[in-house]
Amino acid sequence: MRLPIDVSKISEKDRTNPTVLLLLESIQKQAELIQELKDEIARLKGQSPRPKIRPSRLENTIKSTGKRKGKKGSGSRKKKKTVTLQIHDTIPIEPEDIPDGAVFKGYNDFIVQGLKIEAHNIRYRLKAYETPDGKYICAKLPDNLKGKHFSPDIVCFILYQYHQCGVTQPLLLEQLQEFGIDISKGTLNSILNENKNDFHKEKDQILAAGLEVSSYVNVDDTGARHMGKNGYCTHIGNEAFSWFESTGSKSRINFLQLLRAGHSDYSINVDAIAYMLVNKLPKQPLNAIIANRGTIFSNESQWQEFLVDNDIKNKRHQQIATEGVLLGSIIEYGISKNMVIVSDDAGQFNILSHALCWVHAERLIQKIIPFSDKARKDLETIRDQIWHLYKNLKEYKQSPNDNDKKRLQNLFDQIFNTKTHSAMLNEALKRINGNKSELLLVLDRPDIPLHNNSAENAIRDYVKKRKISGSTRSDSGRKCRDTFTSLKKTCRKLGVSFWQYLHDRICGLNKVPKLSDLIRQQILSTA
């Protein structure tokens, strides 16, 4: 943000004074804090805060100087866009005033695309017969109706409009009624939120399959109020799938519980004990846990009883122990110990092998405002060097080798150990340098991304839905929002039409493969 002091009025001599520069940077920090508090007050009042800072330039595309691939030449024939369309009706048209002796030579086709939007009501007349012995035999409704008074097509349309197109329930109700559909507010809500167990099951299979075959996942979270209380939605995914789950917490315990992919047990195994040792669990509780190595607790209640029985009462000790047995559980179920978690440096995601997003790291530099010519020059130099390093890391991913690995490590040290004329810039460089191992994990694992854009883009879609429809007010509503956001985003990543997917599942056609199978196929084919 802009400094609340006109720097141009400060003399050139004072601008080079270290004390003055330190004071200016201190004022800048205070101004940013004041603006953040103003933004929070504005949000609480229902007003709009200040606009966000411009995005990082790290992922800006380089303009191509050559010709675009696939661009048509001046002499190429124009491709007919309608050649593959299914034709539903054919209407021949005769010319006016055909003279005698004219010979028919064929047709000039002109394709018109249309869409029918109208009510289509069906009366099923279930025949009933009486047998000679006095019993009655009655016909049954088609299975895909499931005893409901609304066809699968209407159910598909409602789900698609609400989850894919972001149409709110009031507008969707008005739309259906204008189309001639006799439907109430309660019935619409029921169609959206009830009897969705098959979809919930497939959503859970998405996470299980993704964790089973992936070498990395991108993670992020966002606020998700529920029933008037603060809550959070966590995203787990990568280029092949997206999975969302809303809970009341954003702790590491919560994240580990989500990674269990539907399982509920707690395992004391080698991996659990190793985690507790790394996190310095004291000897007394650690010995009690080691003495029960190999024990599996089927649910949280049994685990809590174990903690009480073994006099593990300290909150921090309980936290470390619980995180350990949860980690032991997810590794027990097949998650690789080499799984990389790519995040924006939120502490709850720092488990297994942890990689950080370069775009988020560069934002620390981007927000700095220099107060002297030397500081401005230093900032420009550092940003150019970071851009050069990032570009080199992208090239390294395509062709990793030991020589480039060593060179890039040295380049990182050279950039982030630099001392500049800006105290704020020095502090930012020091902070980034402290995350060296997580930012340069790509040198050992060139299969992982350099940024967390995949998770950010996915969570942005959830935020858009939250802004349109507000917070959830029922458990079924929250569960359905998570489920259909997961299914929609995963379909998009797999190249599956969400409309065709909904139609296939609701009509019971089973022509679209399980999304979990498609995830395995896509990830394994690119491994």
Language-model features, listed with the residues they occupy:
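Short, flexible loop/hinge motifs at secondary-structure junctions
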Residues: 1-148, 189, 219, 265-321
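Catalytic center-proximal scaffold of phosphoryl-transfer enzymes
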Residues: 6-10, 128-130, 137-527
